[in-house]
């Protein structure tokens, strides 16, 4: 039996690591969840994700409720108060229980002398809640995005930025990809129905199913057998443009964690696939995904800017480049992105994308297809990136996705329930 731990203090420490140390929640959270019961795993995740989703609101409230911010060794208490405020604002946890557990969290982080302070701040919020929220809802902080990102979205999407921000602040739906080598989508939906769950097919992507209510993967029919994979609908859209065929040599570049690698092999089981990623640790997930689905691909660690180091002079029929990007299209799925990214990251990412595109183009066969994809919402990484590439690359031609003036197809977050995503299909003349 797992030792009872104070979830509020665990959440506060995890959030502090994200915000103060720039660590990714997807790296921090899983080891913490191993320390708690199955029942508590979900609550710990809700507290971490929820606080990061609403961080600017909680920060704003603390600044109103406290004369001085908590600094230095007391900084964890700042995040513990955030966890308390989040519970009072957004969860069904009875207020007395939320307060008691949060105050007790001070003991777990070895700050028992601050129990009274935490209790006082949270009770003051309860008394002033209506007037504080009215003031907050009239401020720019209500958008729950850092100002640099808000400005970029307003500039890029003058008519749509508010709906983008709103979608980013929602909980994401759970999308699945049915493995067509095992089941048709309809036959798997029937199995899902028999298991007492409901799912809905995507109108455009033939393998995509949205669950009515998110569920643990082990509850899904045939998950362990490889019948189904968790993957957002927009990410599945890459296959529409790549259209892999049996017998082709296909490169999946920046492939980890392997969702698109395995999708290529579901669509074209006899394709020869090379999956490459710069991050050796994340490549272990590519191997895991291939193993669960019973598939074979060549997997290599390598830098996309220097392809000759890992593929020599090899030429490919098709290349999928899921480029490293700001991930500003998947904020609803990874709310820590809002606080991990900086404005200065964008030109650096655009430069890296440009270098990878130029380097890999020479490894595409004449007549071959390259699909450039990102989960970004920013033109510098998307349409402007492809426009510049087309201008400097004489043998590149845009195909089916946009126009030379406005190249690519941009999915907005929440549109047809998918994530924000960009695709450009290029043909080598």
Curated annotation (Swiss-Prot):
Any GO MF annotation of the entry: rRNA (cytosine-C5-)-methyltransferase activity
Keywords, in A-Z order: Cytoplasm, Methyltransferase, RNA-binding, rRNA processing, S-adenosyl-L-methionine, Transferase
The EC number(s) this enzyme carries: 2.1.1.176
List of catalytic residues: 375 (nucleophile)
A single GO BP: rRNA base methylation
Subcellular location: Cytoplasm
Residues holding S-adenosyl-L-methionine: 254-260, 277, 303, 322
Domain of life, per lineage: Bacteria
Main location: cytoplasm
Coiled coil location: none
Function (record text): Specifically methylates the cytosine at position 967 (m5C967) of 16S rRNA.
Protein name, entry field: Ribosomal RNA small subunit methyltransferase B
């Amino acid at each position: 039996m797992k030792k009872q731990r104070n979830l509020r203090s665990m959440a506060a420490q995890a959030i502090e690591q994200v915000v103060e140390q720039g660590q990714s929640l997807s790296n921090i959270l899983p080891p913490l969840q191993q320390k708690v019961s199955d029942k508590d795993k979900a609550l710990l995740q809700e507290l971490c994700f929820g606080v990061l989703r609403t961080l600017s609101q909680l920060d704003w409230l603390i600044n109103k409720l406290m004369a001085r911010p908590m600094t230095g060794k007391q900084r964890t208490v700042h995040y513990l108060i955030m966890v308390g405020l989040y519970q009072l604002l957004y969860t069904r946890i009875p207020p007395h229980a939320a307060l008691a557990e949060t105050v007790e969290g001070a003991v777990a982080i070895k700050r028992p002398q601050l129990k009274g302070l935490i209790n006082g701040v949270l009770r003051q919020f309860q008394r002033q809640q209506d007037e504080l929220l009215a003031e907050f809802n009239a401020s720019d902080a209500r958008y729950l995005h850092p100002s640099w990102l808000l400005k970029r979205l307003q500039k890029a999407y003058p008519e749509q930025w508010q709906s983008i921000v709103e979608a980013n602040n929602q909980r994401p739906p759970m999308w699945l990809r049915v493995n067509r080598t095992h089941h048709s989508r309809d036959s798997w939906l029937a199995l899902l129905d028999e298991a007492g769950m409901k799912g809905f097919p995507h109108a455009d992507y033939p393998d995509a199913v949205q669950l009515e209510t998110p569920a643990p993967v082990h509850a899904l029919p045939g998950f362990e057998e490889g019948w189904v994979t968790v993957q957002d609908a927009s990410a599945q859209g890459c296959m529409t443009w790549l259209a892999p065929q049996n017998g082709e040599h296909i490169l999946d570049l920046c492939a980890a964690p392997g969702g698109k690698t395995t999708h290529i092999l579901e669509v074209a089981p006899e394709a020869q696939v090379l999956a490459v990623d710069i991050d050796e640790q994340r490549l272990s997930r590519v191997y895991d995904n291939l193993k669960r689905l019973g598939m074979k691909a060549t997997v290599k660690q390598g830098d996309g800017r220097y392809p000759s180091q890992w593929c020599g002079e090899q030429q490919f029929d098709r290349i999928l480049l899921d480029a490293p990007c700001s991930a500003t299209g998947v904020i609803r799925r990874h709310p820590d992105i809002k606080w991990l990214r900086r404005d200065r990251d964008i030109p650096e990412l655009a430069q890296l994308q440009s270098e990878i595109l130029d380097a890999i183009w020479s490894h595409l066969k004449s007549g071959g297809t390259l699909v450039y994809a990102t989960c970004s919402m920013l033109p510098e990484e998307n349409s402007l990136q492809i426009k510049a590439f087309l201008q400097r690359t004489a043998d590149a031609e845009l195909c089916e996705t946009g126009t030379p003036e406005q190249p690519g197809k941009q999915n907005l977050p929440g549109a047809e329930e998918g994530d924000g995503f960009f695709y450009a299909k290029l043909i080598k003349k």
